[in-house]
Amino acid sequence: MPRSLKKGPFVDAHLFAKVEAAVAANNRKPIKTWSRRSMILPDFVGLTISVHNGRNHVPVIVTEHMVGHKLGEFAPTRTYRGHGVDKKSKR
């Protein structure tokens, strides 16, 4: 269920402060964050944000198509290694 329009998008304050500082200084270094729940705003476009996936930080280059989505959607937390192989069929 989406967030109410009257509340507006949620962005952690510390992340928003880092983004504003990077835009003001025209700094292109990746911004490291653990806030997967923050929504991507139009101010984030063009920046690289390193989102934590539980083990390491995944660099996410924000484009216009990502606006309105959450940061965690672009940093997968699980690695799929395929289903188990049938040992009987190998013989």
Curated annotation (Swiss-Prot):
Gene Ontology MF, one: rRNA binding
Classification via SUPFAM superfamilies: Ribosomal protein S19
InterPro entries linked: Ribosomal_uS19, Ribosomal_uS19_bac-type, Ribosomal_uS19_CS, Ribosomal_uS19_SF
Keyword Plastid belongs to the record: no
GO cellular component, one term: cytoplasm
GO BP term, example: translation
Keywords: Ribonucleoprotein, Ribosomal protein, RNA-binding, rRNA-binding
Highest taxon of the lineage: Bacteria
Family the entry assigns: Belongs to the universal ribosomal protein uS19 family.
PANTHER family noted in UniProt: RIBOSOMAL PROTEIN S19P FAMILY MEMBER, SMALL RIBOSOMAL SUBUNIT PROTEIN US19M
Record's function text: Protein S19 forms a complex with S13 that binds strongly to the 16S ribosomal RNA.
UniProt protein name: Small ribosomal subunit protein uS19
Organism the protein comes from: Acinetobacter baylyi (strain ATCC 33305 / BD413 / ADP1)
Gene, per the UniProt record: rpsS
